[in-house]
Amino acid sequence: MATKAFHECLLDVYHGEMAGEAAFEGMLARAEDAQQRYIVGSLLQFETEGKAKLRPLLMRYDLSMRDDAESMSGAAAAAGQLNALLWVERFSALGDLVRRSYLPRYQELATLVSADEDPEAARIAAFMGAHERALVALSDNIVAGAPDPAAPVSALLSFPLPRPAR
């Protein structure tokens, strides 16, 4: 049986996905070319798919699937601050933010559920940790000038966006 701590962490992760979706939607408006639209659009798709993966658990545990206005407004404000930065600096700051504020909680989710007790919840919890690590890897790739910075995120998408021609 899932614990109260698991339920609370699950909601925090879901709210993190909402925040990410709001932030990347705001960042998409500042994309300067097809490559930037692909990267930010892939991040937006990633957060949307993350929310979809979490909803069956939220429903099973009778937890709210409603959008959290506080998370979304905070994310929109953060996106505005990030958008004021140049592209590489934007992703350097994003990577730092995710490492500090989101990744620990996403990784904690997998420690709060046992695969023996609830295999589906454990699988989704483990995926969400990988999900957030992929977001950090994308940010690091942009800072490093990698040729396909979105690869870690695209590899985990069920519905990846078409990559633009160079």
Regions inferred by a protein language model and the residue ranges of each:
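Non-heme di-metal
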Residues: A2-R166
